[in-house]
Amino acid sequence: MGWCQTRRDHGGVIFVDLRDYTGISQIVFKMEISETSHVLADSIRGEFVLAVKGKVAHRIEGNVNPKLPTGEIEILVETLEILNKSETPPYVLENRENVDEKLRLTYRFLDLRDSTLQNNLMLRSQSLQIVRNYFTSQRFFEIETPILTKSTPEGARDYLVPSRVNPGLFYALPQSPQLFKQLLMISGYDRYMQLARCFRDEDLRGNRQPEFTQIDLELSFTEPEEIYKLTEGLMVKLFEETISVKVETPFQRMTYQESMENYGSDAPDIRFDLKLKDISDIASECELRVFKQVVDKGGIVKAICVPGGADFSRKDLDDLTEFAQIYGAKGMAWIKRNQDGWQSPIGKFFTSEQKEALEERVGLNVGDLVLFCADNTKVVHDALGNLRKEIALRRGLINNSEYRFVWVTDFPLFEYSETEKSFTSSHHPFTMPDIDDLEKYGEQDPEKIRSRAYDVVLNGVEIGGGSIRIHREDIQNKVFRLLKLTDEEIESKFGFLMKALSYGAPPHGGIALGFDRIMMFLLKTDSIRDVIAFPKTQKAGCLMTDAPSAVETEQLDELHIRVKASALQPE
């Protein structure tokens, strides 16, 4: 049984490629075998649903199809039943790669008949079982946490659900099970895991969806080392059992500070070098005014040395400058090192000693190129951090068959929000601070307080993040205070947590791994929509069901909700 992919009539013999999720089989209708089936087969069209019975036979020499696992056999049909007819599909299903994605998402039920997507979802199913089996073997409890919960700040906007029986009040769909898994630790369930559905109302990118799945775990009486080991063990098992790739452990580690200094990013791609080099001290002594001014104002000057990059054309350099400007750079200086010395519009501003010091600092050799960026720290790291990845792509420095994991640790507890003009949590407000830093810097320099947070990064993509949590009420209260929460706000938003912490909360910590992002790596796809059965668009819409959609006035009345007229205006 299956679907008709193609039908061919060769001089009275009808061939049909019958497709199901296992693959394609050729079925053959001959008048001398079954006149009734042969006559009925003449009416078969693409995507008709068929049931056949017959004899399996070897294909005759010359008709073998080596591209199919079933290419050496065919089924000589004795009986045929057309289980259902089909409208003509809006596009040729076998040609999906050349079809606009919006059309494919509108007809997702047809798109999912494609063998690539079916294989993707089967591997996803297999991976889910591997995850469950792994944590079961490690003595974890799989416990579901609520989907309808309280709105608490976790970094993104909440999806809100109005309560009909409590007019004017709202549930929120969980951005993560964070607080519930901490409460489970307080309740004595010392090893929790869940394949959790999470919801975040945020601007979407290629690797984000408004609803997603994360591998969520939490442990009592733990330290980061145990969580690292568990995570690494899962990655080893997952990659080996699904795509036969051996993952090297232990993963490399670096602090947040080291990651930003060397790679300009807290999610470094370590498959290639091109590290950032700080030359602020050398630049401040040269005669190039713009360098000196930046350093005098508290900024930095950093450089990237591109081995063999002296062959970049002027157009290449202009293109790279424009690319850096996307990330805030005002411009970019450069040096080419030839046999005769420096080729650069800024070479005249450096003494021989300064040139020698710079060459040694960045590792400049004959045939290389150095690119400079001078600005405040954030701009320099954003510009050069993204530029190193762009150069690696252009120069073919990335081995796409390589999987390089790295732990990034010791994140700042807070980051300053220019829009809110205040400090916000880098991860979430339940992350344990470095106690020495908390006592030392406190309210005077909160940006200097390190956290006990860690991310796991794969090939430049954050695939998970976690931390040791705050288990003491007094420390949690201090962190809330540093976030400028009042007593009333603490009680209304987190009163239940503070109460729980006062009843003997054990030390605990955990991590959440982005399952959909991991699947993107296993399947080598750049789009998260390729690993989810029914994904949303970048505007968080479902083209197939036309969600989100308007609802009846009666439904809104039941919920005591009125939609502003301005919200109903077309864009």
How would you label these PLM feature ranges?
Residues M1-E571:
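Class II aminoacyl-tRNA synthetase catalytic cores and aaRS-like
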